Amino acid sequence: MATAAEQWVLVEMVQALYEAPAYHLILEGILILWIIRLLFSKTYKLQERSDLTVKEKEELIEEWQPEPLVPPISKDHPALNYNIVSGPPSHNIVVNGKKCVNFASFNFLGLLDNPRVKAAALASLKKYGVGTCGPRGFYGTFDVHLDLEDRLAKFMKTEEAIIYSYGFATIASAIPAYSKRGDIVFVDRAACFAIQKGLQASRSDIKLFKHNDMTDLERLLKEQEMEDQKNPRKARVTRRFIVAEGLYMNTGTICPLPELVKLKYKYKARIFLEESLSFGVLGEHGRGVTEHFGISIDDIDLISANMENSLASIGGFCCGRSFVIDHQRLSGQGYCFSASLPPLLAAAAMEALNIMEENPGIFSVLKEKCKRIHKALQGISGLKVVGESLSPAFHLQLKDSTGSREKDVKLLQEIVNHCMDRSIALTQARYLEKEEKCLPPPSIRVVVTVEQTDEELERAAHTIKEVAQAVLL
């Protein structure tokens, strides 16, 4: 029975072969021959080449110039001329054995050496040990992490918060968690380096607008709107983001948030706000630029900030709606693939948050001190103040550049060194010059804290004026 069936199938195959069109048979024949060729042919060809003579080898060796193992570095490079700090960089700092008033460290609320913060960290150290030895998604989640996230969400009046173990990685992870290839991000040209790295990792289409220029931003949004009208199918799947800083690290200026929110709703974009400098600084209760302008937190899609400037700790956090934050727990690279924040640092941040809530007057004190030194530094010979009067971190730039960045840096460093000799600790703003998208001009960064007395602020301003006049004139 089986033999008869097999014969019938064979007859059908032969009949189908006769009935098939000629081009079909030719195509199948070519494919069969090509498969046979691929199976039996070599995957490479041996190319004939002649060996070099001894003389030719010697000539090549003579001509070869090896690259230096280490690139040439100037003797003035900061890496070769470093300062040694002894003790915590709090109100007073010991640099190279000399005690100075600290105008260089980001310790806005003066909590870095606070006894309560240190006691909370020590108690956590005794309870949990030093590290967690794992990322949050595995065995690196401790109850203190969940408590801190809950406290931050309540403080910022958002649905949920997420903490990262490294401040720089917070916004650098949050941006690529949402913005992907094909999406469009409108970003200020003065954006900090962490934002730049996040944009680079996202592989999105980046459109830069002039610093705090809402007219230029609207121009770019209109151009994109016109492009979307040409291809509505693509526009439906293209997301648009606006990325800004509350207080800009590179300029000390505040973002025009009310105008940004208007443009967001007009052109259907999402706002990501980086508040590392404005959190714990702006607003009646230190909630940042949204509280400063009276903008509803719901108008901002994502807020990011580090805990290294005001909370006297390490790491960072993002806050917003629950569905926005939950997405980061699966897509935030710095959250998924990094060991979680050491519990002692989470406990320190929580205690700092307690102090902020118990003493809201600290923010008005900081604001007054910022205004005081900002006013005192006006009219310096050869230098100009760059930044808002309410910013605790602002810049002193040369009014007239020498035309050489290297020479400008040397002049400013000379001012810093002379101020250090007179017990005022300052620092230049440093950048990875080859990596920066829009490299800011050289500057001296001045940082104000609540611990600095009025007398120290006046003395610092007077010292900077005298030194600048001696160096630049």
Regions found by a protein language model. Give the residues of each.
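PLP-dependent enzyme catalytic core of the Aspartate aminotransferase-like
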Residues: 2-7, 13-24, 28, 33, ...
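N-terminal "arm"/small-domain region of PLP-dependent enzymes with the aminotransferase-like
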Residues: 4-5, 9-130, 269
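Conserved N-terminal alpha-helix of the aminotransferase class I/II PLP-enzyme fold
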Residues: 36, 119-167
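Conserved PLP-binding catalytic core of the aspartate aminotransferase-like
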Residues: 74-76, 81-84, 111, 362-374, ...
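Active-site phosphate-binding strand-loop segment of PLP-dependent enzymes
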Residues: 107, 207, 211-273
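Substrate-binding/gating loop at the entrance of the active-site cleft, primarily
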Residues: 166, 187-203
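Conserved PLP-anchoring active-site segment centered on the Schiff-base-forming lysine
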Residues: 174-193
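Active-site C-terminal subdomain of aminotransferase-like
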Residues: 267-270, 277, 282-390, 396-402
